[in-house]
């Protein structure tokens, strides 16, 4: 399974099909159709949130998947597949990859990342792990813990990186990350043009995830409306 995923997405686009409960397109049926459209366009894989969406998309698209479960806990700011419970639930769907947040913040119930990674490996030895990171330091920690791939997903979305973008200063952050980690890099987060997608691949990223710029019409329409106000 591991080799198949990496081979399937190498040098290609993975499209994130997600809609949260407060968004107009929140529906497993709609996300599955969104994934079908992504497949028709030539996407190599899908990233999806929640067990029900993942299962609907598996039935509809049949592409390699990165699965997550966004879950809020009162005692932590970590929300992307934050505990072993969510990791297990996502892995049980049969997705090729489970992604979880690795941002150095306290996890719910004070779970320790090293311990839950070790336990997950025991229970799901054939499922790949992706680290959704925000800084070089946290990417290196994920690398050390044996995550199979390093994502830039959380860059710009944590207190330490607020307002930052992987495209800043001619992709300086991505170049630095590439020089320091040993695992394949999955570029993700604020990649909103085809040109940025190409740059990420040219800089050596294994694959690129694009979401909002393709699959969130409310955000896309808002950008256009704001331009003429």
UniProtKB/Swiss-Prot annotation:
GO terms for molecular function: N-acylglucosamine-6-phosphate 2-epimerase activity. Pathway: Amino-sugar metabolism; N-acetylneuraminate degradation; D-fructose 6-phosphate from N-acetylneuraminate: step 3/5. It catalyses: an N-acyl-D-glucosamine 6-phosphate = an N-acyl-D-mannosamine 6-phosphate. Disulfide bonds: none annotated. It is an enzyme of class 5 (isomerase). SUPFAM superfamilies: Ribulose-phoshate binding barrel. GO terms for cellular component: cytosol. GO terms for biological process: carbohydrate metabolic process; N-acetylmannosamine catabolic process; N-acetylneuraminate catabolic process. Keywords: Carbohydrate metabolism, Isomerase. Its EC number is 5.1.3.9. InterPro entries: Aldolase_TIM, NanE, RibuloseP-bd_barrel. It holds the Pfam family NanE. HAMAP family: ManNAc6P_epimer (MF_01235). Belongs to the NanE family. NCBIfam families: PRK01130.1. Converts N-acetylmannosamine-6-phosphate (ManNAc-6-P) to N-acetylglucosamine-6-phosphate (GlcNAc-6-P). This is Putative N-acetylmannosamine-6-phosphate 2-epimerase. It comes from Pediococcus pentosaceus (strain ATCC 25745 / CCUG 21536 / LMG 10740 / 183-1w).
